[in-house]
Curated annotation (Swiss-Prot):
Domain of life: Bacteria
Mode of membrane association: Multi-pass membrane protein
Organism: Listeria monocytogenes serovar 1/2a (strain ATCC BAA-679 / EGD-e)
Keyword Transport recorded: yes
Chain segments annotated as transmembrane: 11-31, 70-90
GO molecular function, one term: mechanosensitive monoatomic ion channel activity
Compartments where found: Cell membrane
Protein name as annotated: Large-conductance mechanosensitive channel
Family (UniProt): Belongs to the MscL family.
GO BP terms: monoatomic ion transport
Lineage: Bacteria, Bacillati, Bacillota, Bacilli, Bacillales
InterPro entries: Mechanosensitive_channel_CS (IPR019823), MS_channel (IPR001185), MSC/AndL (IPR037673), MscL_channel (IPR036019)
SUPFAM superfamilies: Gated mechanosensitive channel
């Protein structure tokens, strides 16, 4: 049992697991911000543009069940905004990575064979 706890601790304290945990927490907070933006700013503006339509109240009944498709539309808008924000983040991140790779590729690689030939020639001269 003690060995399993040690293995779990080692697993949990690895950088990738901690990074993932932080990302999940930040993602949840970001989701709340986006939901608030959609619910309180974007959808009311869309409603005004569509003649005062309030999406939160859009629903219909099927028997005793209420189908709230307005809330579903808001969830779709949430998803689109979050997906777009992630897309932009990944696009910016990959552009930084590409720039870094380009600078690494642009640095000239020293011609090791030339250096070795020069060293060989210098050693030959010293032996004479």
């Amino acid at each position: 049992m003690k060995k399993m706890l040690v293995e779990f601790r080692d697993f949990a304290l690895k950088g990738n697991v901690l990074d993932l945990a932080v990302a999940v927490v930040i993602g949840a907070a970001f989701g709340k911000i986006v939901s608030s933006l959609v619910d309180n700013i974007i959808m009311p503006l869309v409603g005004v543009l569509l003649g005062g339509l309030d999406f939160t109240d859009l629903s219909f009944k099927v028997g005793k069940s209420v189908i709230q498709y307005g809330a579903f539309i808001q969830s779709i808008v949430d998803f689109i905004i979050i997906a777009f924000a992630i897309f932009i983040f990944v696009k910016v991140l990959t552009s930084f990575i590409k720039k870094k790779e380009q600078t690494v590729e642009e640095t000239p690689v020293p011609p090791t064979e030339e250096y070795l030939k020069e060293i060989r020639d210098l050693l030959k001269e010293q032996q004479k």
